[in-house]
Amino acid sequence: MQKTTRTMPAHKHVALVAHDNCKPELLRWVKENKEKLQSHFLYATGTTGHMLSKETGLAIKSMISGPMGGDQQLGALISEGNIDVLVFFWDPLNAVPHDPDVKALLRIASVWNIPVATNRATAKFLFNSPLIDQEVDIEVPDYDAYLAERT
């Protein structure tokens, strides 16, 4: 597949997602990183977003709940170039009914080459990188070229 370049803005669009067992851990991480997160645009699946906003006072655009389609809403935003970073604390030890949606969200994040943090350690590395507050060029699929090849 051909690639093109997309420039991520200095103020990133960050999606925050957590499975039920991981919500307390994500909340703790968000509280610890609240000052840094305030300079970015925050999105979340419904239950996670409402909980984080209530507990931290951060402005978060909440989708609907993940099992009801919120994971897919975030995936659509990623594919449109409207999410720059995904922080997804998922529970690898417990299956969830919407597991296909979870896999699709992680797949779409990989397809569109956005950074993904799946636990506290990767989130710490990601948000302590100087790139988190800078414009960054990334390679993404050239959808126009892809479409031209297929039609």
Swiss-Prot record:
Protein name in the entry: Methylglyoxal synthase
GN (gene name): mgsA
GO cellular component: cytosol
Residue numbers annotated as active site: 71 (proton donor/acceptor)
HAMAP family: Methylglyoxal_synth
Reactions performed catalytically: dihydroxyacetone phosphate = methylglyoxal + phosphate
Molecular function GO labels: methylglyoxal synthase activity
Superkingdom classification of source: Bacteria
GO biological process: methylglyoxal biosynthetic process
InterPro entries in the record: Methylgl_synth (IPR004363), Methylglyoxal_synth_AS (IPR018148), MGS-like_dom (IPR011607), MGS-like_dom_sf (IPR036914)
Pfam families tied to this protein: MGS
Domain MGS-like span(s) in chain numbering: 6-151
Keywords for the protein's UniProt record, in alphabetical order: Lyase
Source organism of the structure: Vibrio campbellii (strain ATCC BAA-1116)
